Structures are given as structure tokens and as C-alpha cells.
């Protein structure tokens, strides 16, 4: 396993659509292992392959049970409700924004061996699924947020609100 560099906003790789994974082999396993190590080191809740420079449909999401899920060729197959919530991104460090996302989502994906499965999540897990899957289509949360806040602006705003 190896740490990979997390690509930052402005790199054209983050604006591209990713290709489906067609081979579930050692190369994929190495990528997933590297992404696991990179995400753990960065202390994030999710990481998509394009964030480490690989244009493949693979993401990691930490769910509400603090399990790190690997989703290969994921797709959202159902969703309900809507919540406005705060998001940040490892590719956009130091900035935050409020984004509307579904309150509940159900995903279909494959595991590292190519076995299909479904998973679902609410709240932050649903938000993470949506956020990471958007990366696979070249979209950042900054494209969806009404306003972007610096960490300092957000801290001041939350302090005013008593949070």
C-alpha cells in the first residue's frame, strides 16, 4: 500500500467523467488499498478514484458505522427527501459550502471481486455517497453550493449561531 497525492481543485482530471471498471484484478485491488490508506491518513469521509488521478468509477465512503465501504461502478438506484447540509472536500481544502442532497439513498455497486451488492444510507452517509459519486462525473460540491465559505468564515458563522 502507498499514500497517493490527493488532486486539488483546478486540476482538469477532476472535471472529467470516469470510465467503468471492467477488470477486477490486482491493479484495482492495489488502487483500492492505496485509496484506503490515503483516506485514513487524510481523515476524510470519502475518496473517489479521480481524486488520486485515476479516471475509473471507484469510491470509498465511511458510513455511519465507521466502516469504509468500497463501491465499484456505483449508481444511485433510489433516493428520498432532501436535506441542506455542510460539505467539504479533500480536493478543496480549507473551504466549505451548503449543498442540497437526498436524505436517503440506495446504491448498487460491485465489490473489489466484482460481486454486485446494494447499500443504503441516511444523513451524512447519504450525503457522502452523493458527493463521491458526483466526483465520478466531474462534479465538485463547489459547483452546487450557493456560497463557499473559508474555514475562518465558517467558524465565525457557527460561533455566532452558538454551534
Model-derived features: positions:
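Positively charged
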Residues: 1-163
Amino acid at each position: 500500500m502507498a499514500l497517493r497525492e490527493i488532486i486539488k481543485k483546478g486540476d482538469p482530471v477532476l472535471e472529467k467523467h470516469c470510465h467503468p471498471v471492467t477488470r477486477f484484478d490486482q491493479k484495482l485491488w492495489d488502487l483500492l488499498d492505496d485509496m484506503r490508506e490515503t483516506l485514513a491518513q487524510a481523515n476524510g469521509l470519502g475518496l473517489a478514484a479521480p481524486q488520486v488521478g485515476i479516471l475509473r468509477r471507484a469510491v470509498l465512503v465511511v458510513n455511519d458505522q465507521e466502516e469504509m465501504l468500497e463501491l465499484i461502478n456505483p449508481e444511485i438506484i433510489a433516493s428520498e427527501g432532501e436535506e441542506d447540509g455542510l460539505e467539504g472536500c479533500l480536493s478543496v481544502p480549507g473551504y466549505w459550502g451548503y449543498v442540497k442532497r437526498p436524505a436517503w439513498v440506495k446504491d448498487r455497486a460491485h465489490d473489489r471481486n466484482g460481486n454486485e451488492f446494494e447499500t443504503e444510507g441516511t444523513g451524512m452517509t447519504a450525503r457522502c455517497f452523493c458527493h463521491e459519486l458526483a466526483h465520478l462525473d466531474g462534479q465538485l460540491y463547489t459547483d452546487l453550493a450557493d456560497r463557499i465559505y473559508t474555514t475562518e468564515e465558517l467558524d465565525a458563522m457557527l460561533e455566532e449561531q452558538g454551534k
